[in-house]
Regions:
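Short alpha-helix in the alpha/beta-hydrolase fold that links the catalytic acid
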Residues: 83-101
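A conserved short beta-strand
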Residues: 46-58
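Alpha-helical scaffolding within the catalytic cores
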Residues: 9-10, 55-65
Length: 155
C-alpha cells in the first residue's frame, strides 16, 4: 500500500499546486503499475476521471470504485504470458456484479466498465508475439482504447 499512498499524495500535490482541469485527470497502470493503480482506485477513486488498466491484475478494493462511479477499462491479451486474461475478467465480473446490485442497467454499466481481451491476431498483425511485454506498447497507441480514456469527462 506504500506505493499506492505515494501515488495518491503525488496526485493531490499536482492537483493542489498546478492549474489542472479536475474533470480530466486520468490514470493508467501497466503490469505491476496496474496492481498499484488498482489499489489507488480502491482508496481514492474520486481523484480520477477514469482508469485504464493494461496487462495487469486488480489488487484494490472494488466497492470504492463502484461508489464513485469511476469508469474502468481493462485491456489485456487473451494469452498474456504473465497474468493471463482471467484476473482481468474476474475483476470486471466483480465490479459488474456490484453495479448490478446498485441497480444499474447493463447500458449504464457498459458506459462505466469495459473488458477488452485482445485476441492473438491483435498482436501478431503487428509482428508481436509477446502479449504481456508489448501490450503496454500497443494499448497506449490504440485509438479506440485511448479514445475511450480521453473521452471520459467527470461531471
Amino acid at each position: 500500500d506504500t506505493s499506492a499512498r505515494q501515488t495518491i499524495a503525488l496526485t493531490e500535490y499536482f492537483l493542489d499546486t498546478y492549474n489542472i482541469d479536475r474533470s480530466r485527470v486520468y490514470a493508467e497502470g501497466y503490469s505491476g503499475g496496474g496492481e498499484t493503480m488498482s489499489r489507488v482506485m480502491g482508496m481514492r477513486p474520486d481523484l480520477y476521471t477514469a482508469y485504464l488498466q493494461c496487462s495487469s491484475q486488480w489488487d484494490g478494493n472494488y466497492t470504492e470504485v463502484v461508489k464513485a462511479r469511476v469508469p474502468v477499462y481493462f485491456a489485456i491479451g487473451e494469452k498474456d504470458e504473465y497474468y493471463g486474461s482471467e484476473p482481468s475478467r474476474n475483476a470486471y465480473n466483480a465490479i459488474h456484479k456490484l453495479y448490478e446490485q446498485e441497480g444499474l442497467s447493463n447500458s449504464e454499466i457498459d458506459r462505466l466498465l469495459v473488458l477488452d481481451i485482445k485476441p492473438t491476431s491483435y498482436f501478431s498483425s503487428e509482428g508481436i508475439s509477446n502479449q504481456h511485454g508489448y501490450g503496454g506498447y500497443l494499448f497506449v497507441r490504440d485509438k479506440n482504447i485511448m479514445g475511450w480514456l480521453f473521452g471520459q469527462i467527470k461531471k
